[in-house]
């Protein structure tokens, strides 16, 4: 039995609590990704989270909590994605979504490439690059990150990836009013969504930032 299999029920319950309809086979792929993350983490130090139940809550369910707010997004860039979060779970659940995952640390990008191969994620492309140097062939209608400590940095480094009508999606803890006040000119918070992540006893918010 795999390490995460005993927690498959917790994942299923969390998905139901989020109001999401994800097939059992797709949930099994999410578990398989979590297994890979735990396995590679022993050598590569991809995440500080090592407890299987926390992989379910802090990584998988936390990533899936943003799904309802990305329904209009077709091409998504995940910036500073580390072990592929939230990009890989989103790519697993939405196979029609094109996901570009940008990570500066080579070993983390290498893990993402291995996960892409093992999980057969044709819609997921990891890039070992700095986001400010990235020049995609076509703009993204969504750019997401849960890595940036500052909204200002997120906008200044990643804003050039956003196409007309697109937006930046910042996954944060407590709503960062001071960071919102420091946003660069020409950018505004279009919406703030509180995220109730099942099993996670912490405030989470998704801020949608767009030009205007």
Swiss-Prot record:
Name this polypeptide is given: Ribosomal RNA small subunit methyltransferase G
InterPro entries named among the record's database cross-references: rRNA_ssu_MeTfrase_G (IPR003682), SAM-dependent_MTases_sf (IPR029063)
Record-level Gene Ontology MF annotations: rRNA (guanine-N7-)-methyltransferase activity
Keywords in alphabetical order: Cytoplasm, Methyltransferase, rRNA processing, S-adenosyl-L-methionine, Transferase
UniProt catalytic activity: guanosine(527) in 16S rRNA + S-adenosyl-L-methionine = N(7)-methylguanosine(527) in 16S rRNA + S-adenosyl-L-homocysteine
EC code: 2.1.1.170
The protein's role, per its UniProt record: Specifically methylates the N7 position of guanine in position 527 of 16S rRNA.
GO cellular component: cytosol
Family note: Belongs to the methyltransferase superfamily. RNA methyltransferase RsmG family.
Localization: Cytoplasm
Species this chain originates from: Azoarcus sp. (strain BH72)
One Pfam match: GidB
Binding site for S-adenosyl-L-methionine: 80, 85, 131-132, 146
């Amino acid at each position: 039995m795999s390490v995460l299999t005993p927690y498959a029920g917790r994942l299923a319950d969390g998905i139901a609590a989020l109001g999401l309809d994800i097939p059992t086979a797709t949930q099994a792929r999410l578990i398989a990704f979590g297994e890979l993350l735990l396995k590679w983490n022993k050598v590569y130090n991809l995440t500080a989270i090592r407890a299987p139940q926390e992989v379910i809550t802090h990584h998988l369910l936390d990533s899936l909590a943003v799904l309802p707010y990305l329904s209009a997004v077709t091409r998504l860039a995940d910036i500073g994605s580390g072990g592929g979060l939230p990009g890989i779970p989103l790519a697993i659940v939405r196979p029609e979504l094109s996901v570009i995952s940008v990570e500066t640390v080579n070993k983390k990008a290498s893990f993402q490439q291995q996960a892409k191969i093992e999980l057969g994620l044709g819609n997921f492309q990891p890039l070992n690059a700095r986001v400010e140097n990235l020049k995609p062939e076509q703009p993204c209608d969504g750019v997401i990150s849960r890595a940036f400590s500052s909204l200002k940095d997120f906008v200044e480094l990643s804003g050039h990836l956003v196409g007309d009508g697109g937006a930046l999606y910042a996954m944060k803890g407590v709503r960062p009013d001071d960071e919102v006040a420091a946003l660069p000119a020409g950018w505004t918070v279009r919406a703030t969504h509180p995220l109730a992540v099942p099993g996670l006893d912490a405030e989470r918010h998704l801020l949608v930032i767009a030009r205007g």
